[in-house]
From Swiss-Prot:
Pfam families: UPF0270. Belongs to the UPF0270 family. This is UPF0270 protein HI_0956. Gene3D superfamilies: YehU-like.
């Protein structure tokens, strides 16, 4: 289930982003970025619609996914065809 980031309290959104970064050990390229820099990059992707906050009922967990990849996977799981 996609969670609209606009409906989250600012502190909640910040905590989700930080949790995902710390859990995933996200790689941002050759130069290592600070936690704050990583958070700002991920928040920008969320606000620009590039990334989605997703709740998994199966795993009872929250994650942040690339929008295109998430929608492809959802379509694949539902056996639908993308236009």
């Amino acid at each position: 289930m996609i969670i609209p980031w606009q409906e989250l309290e600012a502190e909640t959104l910040d905590n989700i982003v930080e949790s995902v970064i710390l859990r995933e050990g996200t790689d941002y390229g050759i130069e290592e970025l600070s936690l704050n820099q990583k958070k700002q990059l991920l928040l920008t992707q969320i606000r620009n619609g590039i990334a989605l906050i997703v709740w998994s009922e199966l795993h009872e967990s929250i994650d942040i996914k690339n929008k295109t990849e998430f929608l492809k996977q959802e379509c694949k799981e539902q056996e639908c065809q993308m236009n």
